[in-house]
């Protein structure tokens, strides 16, 4: 039968600064199942180093270490963690209980890393009953005495029913009464067949063991078995265990992820102020992203409405002072357009879809005791569809009304507000420059175009404006709707040639200009997109700052919880388990801040809309992007602290001061 533990010529060397310490120098040792072994020696003798290697908390530099005949030197760090979870139970001088957890949760902690499904609460309670603490299961460690805390640690060591109990100075922080109670528990466990390996420097404690090993300067100088205390006879036959380690299945299938989630959120809630400050950075960042993007989307929507009002594929032709070879001509040398020009342009075959003459002026509007100065625009029949000006309330002019110079008017919403207030203006008679007009429609709201209010307008038939109101015999401009965007260049060239030919203008005569509304639309759209990107970038920077804050907090948390990490590794946590738990904590904080920030961002954008009078639009895309980005920030900025935590060696973490 193979011995339970076997060391062959084991060496262990530590480098402390420039000093080399030979903790173990060629130690050979066998321990059988059922033995109760006490390892003694002065400080620096190597007794703790020997226990750490036997418990797979540390690895030898040289020599062989076997468990039940299996060489464990070649196992990976994760495989050794699995063996510790299956085979070993640890009791430490400092207890190493997690203060934020109840004692029953402390006891069942090793099961989280076992890869086994289940709650295991009843099993943990049974172990607490074994050490006499069944009445204290929902207490926290700081509500217990030192002796009670050590009994909780023993219950935790027993919960996985290990082959071996490793006890490192288990009574070092206890008085004589509590020490005796703890040793009675160890004695009872030994009688039941447990193998116990204990480090102590007290002779009265070592007296409970059936075998005492004394070390000095990294060597075993004495190894005595007490004749009257033989190894427990309760253990018979060979035992096997999963030497490859536990918990190798999917964390989703074996229930580990649920345990990690619970552990992570317990840690988050344990430091409420720190968590609040960490979440605050993400909250501000996400709220800024949502609010800024809502403002950007609102501006974009408003701009789109204005662009829509301009019409698509539109050319605007206006007359102006002639310039021949750069020299301005007199006022008489001005290209003035007539209805014949409109008809000629409209007849340009496949290039032009519609054309409308427009005349502009000012209007003094009077209704009852109300009067208002506004812009007067005379338009043709096709203008309504070309410039998206067909009234939502009322109707557009008929061709006959334009031909007979009918005194009908369509007024903008600003005029309605100033003249009629909340009453319906349709069918009412108003005076425009002292001439009676019947209101037949309300123009669609278009908002502001720069400083100009596009809704402060009165639209009448172009013939009426020219011959009844303004006394003009020429048009102010001609609007042309080109058949398709691809024909804009050809249409401009054809119209230019047509006007020059008809008005007998020289080649270099620029007494008229043609403005491409599509180019204006592109420019405005580009400006809006740039503004949205700028606002989003500013908000994203604040989100990144919040992420850096999360990383700082997590790095501090790793340092503060170094011993906790060491404990988790001692009871079977693998590197990925530790890393995942810290990642869950960082992502949990960022997602929490992100979700709160989403609601706050929507609220802030609505408040801005209310006070500034600027429409905002919160899109689902911005919400999804902000929330997803906050989660990614949790992963990105939490990865370094998580990797740092996972890289800690269990023995180094446990003795961290």
Swiss-Prot record:
Q: What is its main location?
A: membrane
Q: Which residues form the ABC transporter domain?
A: 5-242
Q: Where in the cell is it found?
A: Cell inner membrane
Q: Which GO terms describe its cellular component?
A: plasma membrane
The cysteines covalently paired via disulfide bonds are none
| Pfam families named in the record | ABC_tran, FtsX, MacB_PCD
Cite the EC number. Answer: 7.6.2.-
**Which residues make up the binding site for ATP?**
41-48
The protein's matches in InterPro entries, at most eight in alphabetical order, are given as:
AAA+_ATPase, ABC3_permease_C, ABC_transporter-like_ATP-bd, ABC_transporter-like_CS, MacB-like_ATP-bd, MacB_PCD, Macrolide_Exporter_MacB, P-loop_NTPase
Q: Does the keyword ATP-binding apply?
A: yes
Keyword vocabulary terms for this entry: Antibiotic resistance, ATP-binding, Cell inner membrane, Cell membrane, Membrane, Nucleotide-binding, Translocase, Transmembrane, Transmembrane helix, Transport
Keyword check for ATP-binding, yes or no.
yes
**Quaternary assembly:** Homodimer.
UniProt similarity note:
Belongs to the ABC transporter superfamily. Macrolide exporter (TC 3.A.1.122) family.
Q: What is this protein called?
A: Macrolide export ATP-binding/permease protein MacB
Species name for this entry? Chlorobium phaeobacteroides (strain DSM 266 / SMG 266 / 2430)
Name of the gene this protein is made from = macB
């Amino acid at each position: 039968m193979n011995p339970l533990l076997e060391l062959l010529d084991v060496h262990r060397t530590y480098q402390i600064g420039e000093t080399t310490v030979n903790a173990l120098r060629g130690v050979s040792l066998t321990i059988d199942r059922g033995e109760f072994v006490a390892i003694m020696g002065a400080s620096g003798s190597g007794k703790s180093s020997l226990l750490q290697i036997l418990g797979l908390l540390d690895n030898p530099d040289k020599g062989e270490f076997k468990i039940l005949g299996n060489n464990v030197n070649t196992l990976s760090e994760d495989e050794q963690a699995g063996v510790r979870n299956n085979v070993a139970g640890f009791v430490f001088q400092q207890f190493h209980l997690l203060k934020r957890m109840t004692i029953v949760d402390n006891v069942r902690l090793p099961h989280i890393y076992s890869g086994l499904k289940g709650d295991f609460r009843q099993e943990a309670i049974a172990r607490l009953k074994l050490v006499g603490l069944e009445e204290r299961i929902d207490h926290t460690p700081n509500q217990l005495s030192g002796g009670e805390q050590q009994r909780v640690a023993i219950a935790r060591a027993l919960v996985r029913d290990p082959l071996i109990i490793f006890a490192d100075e288990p009574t070092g922080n206890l008085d004589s009464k509590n020490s005796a109670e703890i040793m009675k528990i160890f004695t009872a466990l030994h009688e039941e067949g447990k193998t116990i390996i204990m480090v102590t420097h007290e002779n009265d404690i070592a007296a409970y063991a059936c075998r005492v090993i004394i070390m000095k300067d990294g060597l075993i100088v004495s190894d005595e078995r007490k004749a009257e205390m033989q190894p427990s006879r309760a253990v018979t036959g060979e035992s096997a265990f999963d030497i490859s380690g536990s918990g190798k299945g999917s964390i989703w299938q074996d229930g580990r992820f649920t345990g990690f989630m619970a552990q992570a959120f317990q840690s988050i809630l344990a430091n409420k102020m720190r968590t609040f400050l960490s979440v605050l950075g993400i909250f501000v960042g996400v709220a800024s992203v949502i609010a800024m993007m809502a403002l950007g989307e609102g501006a974009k929507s408003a701009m789109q409405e204005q662009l829509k009002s301009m019409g698509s594929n539109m050319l605007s032709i206006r007359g102006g002072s002639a310039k021949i070879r750069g020299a301005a001509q007199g006022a008489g040398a001005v290209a003035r357009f007539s209805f014949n020009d409109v008809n000629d342009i409209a007849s340009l075959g496949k290039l032009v879809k519609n054309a409308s003459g427009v005349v502009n002026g000012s209007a003094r509007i009077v209704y009852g005791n109300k009067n208002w100065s506004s812009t007067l625009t005379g338009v043709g029949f096709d203008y309504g569809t070309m410039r998206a000006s067909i009234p939502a309330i009322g109707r557009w002019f008929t061709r006959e009304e334009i031909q007979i110079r009918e005194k009908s008017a369509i007024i903008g919403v600003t005029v309605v507000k100033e003249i009629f207030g909340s009453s319906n203006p349709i069918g009412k008679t108003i005076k425009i420059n002292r001439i009676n007009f019947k209101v037949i429609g309300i123009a669609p709201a278009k908002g502001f175009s720069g400083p100009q209010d596009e809704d402060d307008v009165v639209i009448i038939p172009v013939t009426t404006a020219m011959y009844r109101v303004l006394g003009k015999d020429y048009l102010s401009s001609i609007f042309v709707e080109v058949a398709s965007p691809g024909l804009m260049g050809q249409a401009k060239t054809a119209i230019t040639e047509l006007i020059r030919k008809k008005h007998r203008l020289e080649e270099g005569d620029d007494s008229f200009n043609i403005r491409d509304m599509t180019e204006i639309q592109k420019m405005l759209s580009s400006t809006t997109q740039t503004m949205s990107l700028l606002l989003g970038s500013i908000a994203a920077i604040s989100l990144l700052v919040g992420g850096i804050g999360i990383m700082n907090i997590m790095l501090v948390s790793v340092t503060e919880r170094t011993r906790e990490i060491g404990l988790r590794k001692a009871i079977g946590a693998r590197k990925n388990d530790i890393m995942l738990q810290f990642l869950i904590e960082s992502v949990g904080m960022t997602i929490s801040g992100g979700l709160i920030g989403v609601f706050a961002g929507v609220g802030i954008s609505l408040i801005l809309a209310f006070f500034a009078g600027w429409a905002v639009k919160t899109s689902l895309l911005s919400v999804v992007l902000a929330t997803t980005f906050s989660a990614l920030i949790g992963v990105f900025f939490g990865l370094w602290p998580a990797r740092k935590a996972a890289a800690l060696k269990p023995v180094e973490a446990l003795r961290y001061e």
